[in-house]
């Protein structure tokens, strides 16, 4: 098993078919007279049609030997008996066995051509009216259109499922649209790399300076740079990048850009002296966020009386004394519709947040606690002793196949019931998510946004939390005082040193902070492995699953790739009792810690209490619980959710014994081991070190070169993100 093969035959029966994604299990009668099971993306397969399947033999735990289809060439039925089987299979609604036999009896082997090209002749058959003849012909043309689109994709080695997607988006015009403009495949609906779509188009005879090529390059650069955090690109940068991508002079590209601006395909606006170019979606998102927040600030919430009394009551019952800024935060939360609460570790954000929640409870408000990640939501719920959930799940996020975009059940037409919403880890919230959240808040709802402005910005487009703070328009409480009990933590002390541009005190080596000097990368890695495998579990009672290794980079001797190889070998080595599955350079093994690396809005999960749902998101960390013997199905556990992954979903997973600091944003771990090793200059900066250190709850160990933490603390270089949100807020909002 596992051998590659190519078989040719005729479909005998269809065992299973998913009309949404084209996944099919069928029996194929080969030319040698054998019946084999084939599984894969073969949309609208039906008995009687011929096909040549290329794939890999596997053994399914329930269904035995079968071929996992990678590529398929299909041909329409040729013989009369095959045509009857094909039409009687249910492939055309309204055609059963008797009608299929009458059609073939009348038109013979010409039946399928008549269905497609001469539908008026179908009404010669008893029981088929002229109207029904046209309906049958239309349905058949759609099927043949899908088949031709599949053949078109296969010709250029593109996945067959893209044909299904193209027909969802463009219907019967799919093949024509793609032939006219293959660069459509590089758009959000399909996600094909521009270089691949470009290679395909040029091989089809498109000119290097065709308008559709230049337009696609401009949109690709805007969308690609959203992944780098930019909401817009300066016009000159966009022109240069697109020109470089397709090898044309910038002035040739500029003409196309002007046309796209005139047509509204790209939005253009002056932003702080720069002519910025936006995708329409991000332009509208930025305008909406600014306008919504400003309207919330203008909303007449009314004066709340007795706030001081509530604060004093909380102080008495909890035996604490709030600092002046904490009291101010509680008061502002009551009086203002929007509040920003920021501060570093140990400055009392959690205490202030709990006080605000208690005040809102006293006011009788319906309260929602939200965070951008599952770990952050769990932590927030524990600290506030209330249920908290992710923003995505609260808003009912899903994925729209037709547009290639995220959609939400909750919004302006169906807002949340909440009267007060508190959002933690705001530095992780990007512009599109902020737009979705604000659109779901009903008029009069209060919003408290909590976070640490000095942490790294969101992975997605925008610098929302920082922009809100720097705009000066949103009420802000910035907690700075480190409380006495927190000041005993060397993690917190050193984090504040780093945030002030001073390297951490590496000589501390007591309490919750330790530094182990290792200047050779091999020694750094071996020390990390030893800490995770033996020293921390045996000396400090910290289990390996409570330890997270962080490093600034994926690449290099101390990057996540190499660290994960070494940690997997030490913590979860091969065993006869553990099944495993190889995927590229990775070997997934039962017991492995893994991370989801892209949003999957459709994958189904089940909680321990039987609750069902969908969606596993970028950054979610889980454990491989079980791998079936064939390696084609993996059972993963993400906290209290169990999820089934098929082999074709493994490109969404990576090992997570070690992860990058960026991936750790919004999460907190009992123990963190941080690598201080050489890396790209853009990664050895203050924000990366500060974010990494503040991920540790009880123990932080830095392993590496003793010169690097100080260099990182001194380097406050921040990668610029092009965003106009701060300006829009300052200027009072802008209409989209």
Where are the regions that the model predicts?
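Accessory, non-ATPase domains that flank or precede helicase/AAA+ motor cores in DNA-metabolism machines
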Residues: 1-309
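Hydrophobic anchor at the beta1->P-loop junction of P-loop NTPases
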Residues: 341, 369
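C-terminal accessory regions
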Residues: 618-736
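N-terminal pre-P-loop "Q-motif" helix
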Residues: 319-335
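Conserved helicase motor core of P-loop NTPases
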Residues: 453-614, 625
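Conserved helicase motor core of SF1/SF2 NTP-dependent helicases
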Residues: 355, 359, 363-365, 371-383, ...
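Walker A (P-loop) phosphate-binding loop of P-loop NTPases
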Residues: 346
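Conserved lysine of the Walker
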Residues: 349
């Amino acid at each position: 098993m596992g051998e590659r093969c190519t078989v040719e035959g005729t479909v005998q029966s269809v065992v299973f078919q998913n009309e949404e994604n084209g996944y099919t299990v069928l029996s194929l009668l080969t030319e040698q007279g054998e019946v084999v099971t084939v599984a894969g993306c073969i949309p609208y397969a039906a008995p009687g049609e011929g096909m040549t399947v290329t794939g890999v033999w596997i053994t399914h735990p329930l269904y035995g030997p079968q071929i996992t289809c990678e590529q398929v060439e299909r041909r329409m039925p040729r013989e009369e008996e095959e045509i009857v089987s094909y039409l009687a299979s249910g492939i055309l609604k309204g055609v059963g066995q008797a009608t299929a036999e009458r059609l073939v009896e009348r038109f013979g082997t010409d039946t399928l051509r008549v269905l497609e090209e001469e539908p008026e002749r179908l009404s010669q058959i008893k029981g088929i009216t002229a109207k029904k003849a046209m309906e049958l012909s239309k349905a058949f043309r759609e099927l043949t259109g899908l088949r031709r689109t599949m053949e078109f994709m296969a010709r250029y080695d593109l996945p067959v499922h893209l044909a299904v997607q193209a027909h969802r988006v463009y219907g019967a015009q799919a093949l024509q649209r793609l032939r006219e403009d293959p660069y459509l495949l590089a758009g959000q609906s399909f996600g094909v790399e521009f270089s691949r779509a470009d290679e395909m188009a040029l091989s089809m005879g498109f000119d290097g300076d065709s308008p559709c090529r230049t337009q696609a390059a401009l949109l690709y650069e805007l969308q690609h740079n959203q992944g780098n955090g930019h909401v817009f690109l300066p016009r000159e940068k966009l022109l240069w990048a697109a020109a470089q991508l397709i090898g044309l002079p910038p002035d040739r590209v500029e003409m196309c850009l002007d046309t796209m601006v005139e047509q509204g395909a790209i939005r253009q606006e002056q932003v702080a002296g720069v002519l910025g170019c936006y995708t329409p979606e991000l332009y509208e998102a930025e305008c909406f966020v600014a306008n919504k927040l400003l309207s919330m600030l203008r909303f007449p919430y009314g004066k709340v009386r007795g706030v001081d009394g509530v604060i004093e009551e909380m102080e008495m019952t909890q035996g604490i004394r709030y600092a002046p800024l904490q009291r101010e935060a509680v008061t502002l939360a009551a009086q203002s519709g929007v509040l920003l609460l920021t501060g570093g570790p140990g400055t009392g954000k959690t205490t202030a947040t709990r006080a605000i929640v208690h005040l809102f409870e006293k006011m009788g408000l319906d309260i929602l606690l939200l965070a951008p990640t599952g770990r952050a939501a769990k932590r927030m719920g524990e600290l506030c002793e209330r249920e908290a959930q992710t923003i995505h799940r609260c808003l009912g996020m899903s994925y729209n196949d037709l547009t290639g975009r995220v959609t939400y059940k909750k919004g302006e037409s169906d807002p949340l019931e909440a009267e007060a919403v508190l959002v933690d880890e705001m530095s992780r919230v990007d512009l599109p998510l902020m737009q979705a959240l604000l659109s779901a808040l009903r008029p009069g709802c209060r919003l408290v946004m909590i976070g640490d402005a000095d942490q790294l910005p969101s992975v997605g487009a925008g610098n929302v939390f920082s922009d809100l703070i720097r705009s000066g328009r949103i009420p802000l409480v910035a907690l700075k005082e480190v409380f006495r009990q927190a000041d005993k933590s060397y993690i917190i002390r050193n984090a504040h040193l780093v945030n002030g541009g001073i390297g951490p005190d590496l000589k501390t080596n007591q309490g919750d902070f330790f530094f182990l000097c290792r200047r050779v990368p091999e020694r750094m890695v071996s020390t990390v492995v030893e800490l995770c495998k033996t020293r921390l579990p045996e000396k400090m009672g910290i289990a390996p699953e409570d330890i997270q290794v962080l490093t600034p980079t994926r690449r290099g001797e101390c990057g996540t790739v190499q660290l994960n190889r070494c940690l997997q070998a030490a913590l979860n080595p091969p065993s006869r009792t553990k099944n495993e599955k190889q995927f590229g350079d990775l070997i997934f093994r039962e017991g492995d810690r893994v991370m989801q690396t892209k949003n999957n809005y459709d994958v189904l999960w089940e909680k321990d209490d039987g609750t069902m749902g969908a969606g596993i998101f970028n950054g979610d960390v889980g454990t491989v619980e079980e791998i079936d013997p064939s390696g084609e199905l993996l059972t993963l556990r993400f906290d209290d959710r169990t999820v089934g992954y098929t082999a074709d979903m493994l490109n969404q997973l990576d090992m997570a014994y070690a992860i990058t600091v960026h991936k750790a944003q919004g999460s907190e771990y009992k123990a963190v081991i941080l690598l201080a090793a050489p890396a790209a200059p853009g990664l050895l900066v203050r924000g990366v070190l500060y974010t990494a250190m503040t991920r540790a709850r009880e123990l932080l160990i830095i392993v590496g070169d003793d010169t690097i933490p100080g260099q990182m603390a001194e380097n406050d270089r921040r990668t610029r993100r092009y965003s106009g949100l701060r300006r829009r807020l300052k200027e009072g909002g802008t209409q989209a």
